[in-house]
Amino acid sequence: MGGLDVRMRDVHCWHGRTAAVSEVDLEIAAGQRVALTGTNGSGKTTLMRAVLGLHRHFSGTVLVGGCSARTATEWAQRRRACAWIPQKPAAGRFPLLGSELLASSGAAGEAADAAARLGVASLTGNPLHTLSGGQLQRMYLARAIGSIAAGADVLIADEPTAALDFDGQDEAADILTGLPVTLIVVTHDRALANRCDRVLEMAAGRLREIA
Ligand SMILES: Nc1ncnc2c1ncn2[C@@H]1O[C@H](COP(=O)(O)OP(=O)(O)OP(=O)(O)O)[C@@H](O)[C@H]1O
C-alpha cells in the first residue's frame, strides 16, 4: 500500500472574518482511509481546499509527506501529490471538455481507460457543464485515477458518490477504498464511511474522531 502521511496542526480557516474551521489537529498515516463526515456547513470542504491550496485564508500547519507548501512551486507540488475530486467544478474555469479534464491528470491514457470502465468514455468530447451530476462524478473519479497513475499518493474526494446511482455508489466505493493511496473522503454516505479505516466528524468547524 502506497500513500503519504498527512498532518495538520492547529489549522484555522476563515471566509472573510468568519471562522469556518477551528483548531484542527489531525494525523493520518500513509495509506490510511479516512472518512470525514459531519453537518452541512461544518467546514469539511473548506478544510480540504486548504490542504490543496485552493483556500488560502488559513493558519496553522499542513504537511503532506512531511512537506509544507508556501511558494507557488510548493503548492504545485502539493497538487501533484494530492489527486482531487471536488464537490462541484470551479465555475467558468478550464478544463471545459471531459477529455481536457482527463488530460489534466497528467496521465491522459490511464484516465481515459478509467473513464471507459466507469461508462463515460462516450462523453469525453462533451463540455463538462452538459454532463449529469453522476456522469460528472464518474469523469472526476477517472481523472483521479489518472492523477494517481501520474504519481499522486493522496486522494482527497469531496462527496464523490453523492450524485451516483446505487450501483455506481458501490462501484465508486470499491474503487476509492482500493486505490494504493492515502484517502480522505468527505461523505454523507454511511456505507462508504463504514468501509474506511477511520471516521471523523466535523461540527461547527471542529473535528473529532468517532470511529
Ligand atoms: N465562498 C464562501 N464565502 C463565504 N462563506 C463560505 C464560502 N464557502 C463556504 N462558506 C461558509 O463556510 C462554512 C463551511 O462551509 P463548507 O463548504 O466548508 O462546509 P461543508 O462541511 O463542506 O458543508 P456540506 O456538508 O454542506 O458540503 C459554511 O458556513 C459556509 O456557509
How should each PLM-predicted stretch be described?
Residues 127-135:
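Conserved ABC ATPase signature
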Residues 153-159:
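Catalytic Walker B motif of ABC-type/P-loop ATPase nucleotide-binding domains
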Residues 52:
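Helix-to-loop junction immediately C-terminal to a conserved catalytic motif
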Residues 68-83:
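ABC ATPase NBD coupling module
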Residues 6, 20-23:
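Conserved structural motif at the start of ABC-family nucleotide-binding domains
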Residues 109-123, 145:
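Conserved ABC ATPase "signature" region
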Residues 37-39:
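The feature captures the beta-strand-to-loop junction immediately N-terminal to the Walker
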Residues 88, 94-110:
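Q-loop/switch helix immediately C-terminal to the Walker
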